[in-house]
């Protein structure tokens, strides 16, 4: 039997504040510490998932923010590595669903009409996980689709595109001339 040693409140606060820090060295040390915890004590991450989802979600959100917005490439890479190790510690929770043909068990794409391996019709198949169907044509659809690949029906309203600074990749307003985060000139004065 494995004895679970959960993260102390001090450790949790240290990780969250370290990931929020504006000092790159502090972020890097925190990322490495989190990697070590995920590798050496994965049960501590699982414990967080079970008993302190708020902190775990905050850690994952902060890692994603570093990956998306941090101007330092080394920190972005370390955050990606850390996130993968945390996901690995959490196990199958983050694995992606790949639909398999009911007849031949080959991987299929929900955009296909027939299995490319055996010719079975995909519309009539059932899957282990619940897969949405198009309200217009009743074919299976993917969560990420904006339009149905079978009939072209609109599935989602288009999200407003967020403008980002080409230099630091942070969100900027269209009327801004200079990025307030890094000083990059966004457009010329009229």
Curated annotation (Swiss-Prot):
Disulfide bonds: none annotated. InterPro entries: ARM-type_fold, Double_zinc_ribbon, DZR. A zinc finger (DZANK-type) spans 134-183. GO terms for molecular function: zinc ion binding. It holds the Pfam family DZR. Keywords: Metal-binding, Zinc, Zinc-finger. This is Double zinc ribbon protein MJ0416.
